[in-house]
Regions:
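Conserved nucleotidyltransferase catalytic core and NTase-mimicking acidic/glycine-rich helix/loop elements
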Residues: 113-223
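Conserved NTP/Mg2+-binding pocket subregion across the NTase superfamily
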Residues: 53-140
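Generic structural "secondary-structure junction" signal
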Residues: 32, 93-94, 170
Length: 223
């Protein structure tokens, strides 16, 4: 990650040269320590306009999001995923406005409850997936089963986050936070992602039934 840190230093020197860039924040995998050589740099800058720029800096792709305070505040209230922009960020410079947004994000995250309609939509999708998986297993169609697993794993993860009353994070962060989910299926991550086709299918079916019907032996911690 040394290349990323050198590129970050180059970028922040340029951004800090302008007083208009009042807050500068590092987001993404570099911020929460899960970056690899192919990871981008993702920065948020609070200023007086909304814009975006992307460039390669010392061989590292960098994306910089420029936003007004009001734009970010509105997004926090309209897009639950936006809270993660603040929960796992690293502040480089702040005039106080970013701190206000971060505090609001923490409050929204702690009070978040998945809307009933959202849960119903997820379960409608997953119930259909369950029937398709069962049909593929009955006919021993491994190719069809594997296809269903690959195209529906993300929806299962959405369901697990929703059942735990957490906004669904961006995909890279979602993987990083899987251990924070209360899921009463032993070694479910390994079985769902690394098992044989049969093991993956069995695990997905168990998770779907847990998500959509919350079977009596399963409970979710509240709070």
């Amino acid at each position: 990650m040394q290349k990323h840190l050198r590129a970050l230093e180059t970028i922040t020197e340029r951004l800090q040269a302008s007083a208009q860039n009042r807050s500068i924040v590092l987001n993404g995998s570099v911020a929460y320590g899960n970056a690899d050589d192919a990871s981008d740099l993702d920065l948020l800058v609070l200023c007086d306009w909304d814009g975006f720029e992307s460039s390669s800096v010392e061989g590292i792709m960098a994306e910089i999001h420029f936003h007004r305070f009001d734009t970010l505040l509105a997004r926090l209230h309209s897009k639950p995923m936006e809270v993660y922009r603040y929960l796992y960020a690293k502040v480089i410079r702040d005039d106080g406005n970013y701190a206000v947004l971060a505090q609001r994000a923490r409050e929204l995250y702690q009070s978040y409850r998945t809307p009933v309609q959202s849960m119903e939509k997820i379960c409608y999708w997953l119930s259909s997936t369950e029937q398709k998986l069962l049909a593929a297993l009955r006919t021993q169609n491994d190719l069809r089963t594997a296809y269903l697993l690959s195209t529906n794993t993300w929806k299962v993860l959405e369901g697990l986050y929703a059942l735990n009353h957490k906004p669904v994070p961006p995909s890279s962060l979602a993987f990083h936070l899987l251990d924070t989910l209360d899921v009463p299926v032993e070694q479910w991550q390994q079985k769902l992602l690394l098992g044989t086709v049969e093991t993956k299918a069995e695990t997905m079916l168990r998770l779907i039934r847990f998500i959509c019907r919350t079977e009596p032996e399963y409970t979710i911690r509240q709070g």
